[in-house]
């Protein structure tokens, strides 16, 4: 009997999911992306060689692992084809192992133009999107006007829908944002070129998953971004446009929730965030700079510097509840090496002095101050440790306190970027 495991982020993204998915896929028959788009950036380091993936599931570097892109992913054909080419140049076979749902909404040039025009118009109040068209593509999907991958293979139907879409979006671009219109013929010609290249990779992803399940195969579902960026459960409106939480697994792949056996939540030993939005434990001092430098905190997709702060047990407790987390993976523990004192946020205090749990919208964070516990740090290195006993006593105490504060076990500890620099206390597929 196979096991079906979800791996997702429990903070604001960038928790180190790519490495863990790559590590665990040694046992998986297939890896599935079920939401998001090429706004994700999953970094893998294998024997010192770094690979960044945006759309292709992180199992692609494991020989024989099937990689699936489910219907919940918004797909930019140009970005996907560039990613395939880069991997193939490294000798990684992709096309025969990658399968894409024809129900994936397409991201085309007008989505990118709209995304960037909106952020430009917002000025200082911008959301902090990647500018890659993710939000506008999801809007078209929900408005039931979007083009999907399957439409690419019906030229006349595609052209008719594209014409209607460009009439609508070009009106907004030209008359509201004062930006140039997107050319119909150029967009159509590019799309038809994509169609020829994508057609061999089309498949009914839901049917593929259920066939694997019936044959007792292990399946991994790879989340993108983080739980606090979820369109419904995140710090709205500073969120992404998809469901980044465990519920998105079913809707974004066609694999029912009762088939899932284990949900692994990835969390950093501290907290980071890219772009705008509330961040109660954010640091603006030397410690924040230390975390950013030691943790190489720059976005894999945009290159933007990440905001850094202390570990926040409040947001993690919320993420554990909404995802029904089975166990946690604590990443980047080694970044805390060398600090005299480490802090953990255990609650938020408002102006009345009351200690609160995590709010559900951005405005409710205004005026909240973090309540901290302090613990002694450690001077010894944790880099590359492969057993719990190899860790300094204070690091072990920190791990134990995190478990106590959030009410979930830490099953995996990452002690470096390479897939081998990991302590596995309980294997999700065991």
Swiss-Prot record:
GO terms for biological process: 'de novo' AMP biosynthetic process; IMP metabolic process. Pathway: Purine metabolism; AMP biosynthesis via de novo pathway; AMP from IMP: step 1/2. Disulfide bonds: none annotated. It is an enzyme of class 6 (ligase). The keyword Signal does not apply. Binds 1 Mg(2+) ion per subunit. Belongs to the adenylosuccinate synthetase family. This is Adenylosuccinate synthetase. It comes from Pseudomonas paraeruginosa (strain DSM 24068 / PA7).
């Amino acid at each position: 009997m196979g096991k079906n495991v979800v791996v997702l982020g429990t903070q604001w993204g960038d928790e180190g999911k790519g490495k863990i998915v790559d590590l665990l896929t040694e046992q998986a028959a297939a890896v599935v992306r079920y939401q998001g788009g090429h706004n994700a950036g999953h970094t893998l380091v294998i024997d010192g060689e770094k690979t960044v993936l945006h759309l292709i599931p992180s199992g692609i570097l494991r020989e024989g692992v099937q990689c699936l892109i489910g219907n919940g992913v918004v797909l930019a054909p140009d970005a996907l084809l560039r990613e395939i080419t880069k991997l193939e140049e490294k000798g990684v076979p992709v096309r025969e192992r990658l399968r894409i749902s024809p129900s994936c909404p397409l991201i085309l040039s007008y989505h990118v133009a709209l995304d960037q025009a909106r952020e430009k118009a917002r000025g200082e109040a911008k959301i902090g999107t990647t500018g890659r068209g993710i939000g506008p593509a999801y809007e078209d999907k929900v408005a039931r006007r979007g083009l999907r991958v399957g439409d690419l293979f019906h030229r006349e139907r595609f052209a008719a829908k594209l014409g209607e879409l460009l009439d609508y979006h070009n009106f907004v671009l030209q008359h509201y944002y004062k930006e140039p219109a997107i050319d119909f013929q150029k967009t159509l010609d590019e799309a038809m070129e994509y169609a020829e290249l994508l057609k061999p990779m089309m498949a009914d992803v839901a049917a593929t998953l259920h066939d694997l399940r019936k044959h007792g195969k292990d399946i991994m579902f790879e989340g993108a971004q983080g739980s606090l960026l979820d369109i419904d459960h995140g710090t709205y409106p500073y969120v992404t446009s998809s469901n980044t939480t465990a519920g998105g697994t079913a809707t974004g792949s066609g694999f029912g929730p009762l088939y899932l056996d284990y949900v692994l939540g990835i969390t950093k030993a501290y907290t980071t965030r890219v772009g705008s939005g509330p961040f109660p434990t954010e640091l603006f001092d030397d410690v924040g700079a230390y975390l950013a430098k030691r943790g190489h905190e720059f976005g894999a997709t945009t290159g933007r510097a990440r905001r850094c702060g202390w570990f926040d047990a409040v947001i993690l407790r919320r993420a554990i509840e909404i995802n029904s987390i089975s166990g946690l993976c604590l990443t980047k523990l080694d970044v805390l090496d060398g600090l005299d004192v480490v802090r953990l946020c255990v609650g938020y205090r408002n102006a009345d002095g009351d200690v609160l749990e995590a709010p559900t919208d951005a405005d409710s964070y205004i005026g909240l101050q973090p309540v901290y516990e302090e613990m002694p740090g450690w001077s010894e290195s944790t880099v590359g440790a492969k057993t719990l006993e190899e860790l300094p006593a204070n690091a072990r105490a920190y791990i134990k306190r995190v478990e106590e504060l959030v009410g979930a076990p830490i099953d995996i500890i990452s002690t470096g970027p390479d897939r081998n620099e990991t302590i596995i206390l309980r294997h999700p597929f065991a």
